[in-house]
Amino acid sequence: MGSRVSREEFEWVYTDQPHAARRKEILAKYPEIKSLMKPDHNLIWIVAMMLLVQLASFYLVKDLDWKWVIFWSYVFGSCLNHSMTLAIHEISHNFPFGHHKALWNRWFGMFANLSLGVPYSISFKRYHMDHHRYLGADKIDVDIPTDFEGWFFCTTFRKFVWVILQPLFYAFRPLFINPKPITYLEIINTVIQITFDIIIYYVFGVKSLVYMLAATLLGLGLHPISGHFIAEHYMFLKGHETYSYYGPLNLLTFNVGYHNEHHDFPNVPGKNLPMVRKIASEYYDDLPHYNSWIKVLYDFVTDDTISPYSRMKRPPKGNEILE
């Protein structure tokens, strides 16, 4: 159903990602940006409050009709859970407690993970660091879709289905592209999460458990906030690999929309990324950017020139050190 996309292959490039060179140039001109590279201790209480709100919602939905359980999981729970995945993104960069307390951040990530219903935090951190170091690297960066995704989801309707199924692809894609041995922290993350899920089931009932899981699945699929998955690196304009978003949903997502700024300065917490743009405005104001994630989703589905193949990809150099 729907028209077929014109792209049949990834955009292969043989140059380094632009972020390291731009970071070096900006720091030489604006060394004060180094002062923004510091922990964000506010994340600790923000995440705790988010988890408490979600626990309260488990209580509020436990006796609702099923239609209202699903309704509120999409309208409210999905926003909270997607926001929590982006809090976990901040935690993966060691922002709550700082780099000198890396293990504290891993434990805090497991705490933040609780409201999602599925173990996520530890595995995300391992793959996300590879994404930053080796952006677009073949068989390393699992943010790049598989060849199957690019080949199969090649019509308007199929791209729409692909957007809905985004959380499943992000969950299983690493197993096909860059499988890693399981670590003890991932096992602990899984055991803690399953234990929490069982407690939710026995304390609140099956409706609260379904609400929690549906909020994660729906929130990471066809949802306004999910526009960031596509907006960040899908090549809407040839030659441009990373795009920022400067719209209001940054307030719910720890400024993940400031994505060029984030890749240029991964040691700057989200709350300080607007300052990076302000200080080095001449480097960012003229770069292509978005003001609406909803429009990004619409354009991705309806534009015949855009598909899961619309990513810049690099052959690995062979000297990569993976997490």
Swiss-Prot record:
A lipid is attached at residue 2 (N-myristoyl glycine). It is a multi-pass membrane protein. Coiled coil: none annotated. Keywords: Endoplasmic reticulum, Fatty acid biosynthesis, Fatty acid metabolism, Isomerase, Lipid biosynthesis, Lipid metabolism, Lipoprotein, Membrane, Mitochondrion, Myristate, Oxidoreductase, Phosphoprotein, Transmembrane, Transmembrane helix. GO terms for biological process: ceramide biosynthetic process; fatty acid biosynthetic process; myelin maintenance; positive regulation of apoptotic process. Interacts with RLBP1; the interaction increases synthesis of chromophore-precursors by DEGS1. This is Sphingolipid delta(4)-desaturase DES1. The lineage of its organism: Eukaryota, Metazoa, Chordata, Craniata, Vertebrata. The gene is Degs1.
